[in-house]
């Protein structure tokens, strides 16, 4: 949040943040709770425009050490994605490149408000 405060003080009117599907400040899961608390903190700062991207599992090449749980999830993603329909579509995996393209598409959008973008919306923005 310190970087966001600094950006706001420097005159930024829009903030775009990558959070996570399932983010909620009251979640029992530490990761999702931290993401939710961060979202709430950003809302409280009062940017004219706040875009919160909530991707599922990010797919693509990564630098750094490989985590076992993440490796298992990446291997299982194609099968899991095929089974996730309807309201569960938001839990599907998504390429990191798609999320990056959505960010570029959102940058500079002057319409005020807080917008939540899940996988399907990010895919539309990236096209």
Question: Which residue stretches match the model-derived regions?
Answer:
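NAD(P)-cofactor binding segment of oxidoreductase domains
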Residues: 1-15, 37, 41, 105-108
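Membrane-targeting and insertion segments and their boundary/processing signals
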Residues: 8, 12, 16, 70-77
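Oxidoreductase cofactor-interface core, primarily capturing Rossmann-like NAD(P)-dependent enzymes
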Residues: 25-126
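SDR active-site strand-loop-helix element
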Residues: 15-21, 53-55
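Glycine-rich NAD(P)-binding loop of the Rossmann-fold in SDR/ketoreductase-type enzymes
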Residues: 2, 21, 33
């Amino acid at each position: 949040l310190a970087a966001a405060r600094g950006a706001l003080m420097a005159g930024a009117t829009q903030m775009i943040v990558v959070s996570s599907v399932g983010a909620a400040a009251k979640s029992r899961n530490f990761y999702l709770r931290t993401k939710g608390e961060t979202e709430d903190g950003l809302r409280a700062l009062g940017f004219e425009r706040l875009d919160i991207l909530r991707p599922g599992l990010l797919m693509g090449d990564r630098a750094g050490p490989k985590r076992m749980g993440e490796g298992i999830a990446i291997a299982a993603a194609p099968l899991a994605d095929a089974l996730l329909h309807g309201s569960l579509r938001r839990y599907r995996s998504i390429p990191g490149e798609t999320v990056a393209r959505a960010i570029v598409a959102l940058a500079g959008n002057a319409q005020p408000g807080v917008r939540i973008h899940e996988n399907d919306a990010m895919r539309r923005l990236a096209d």
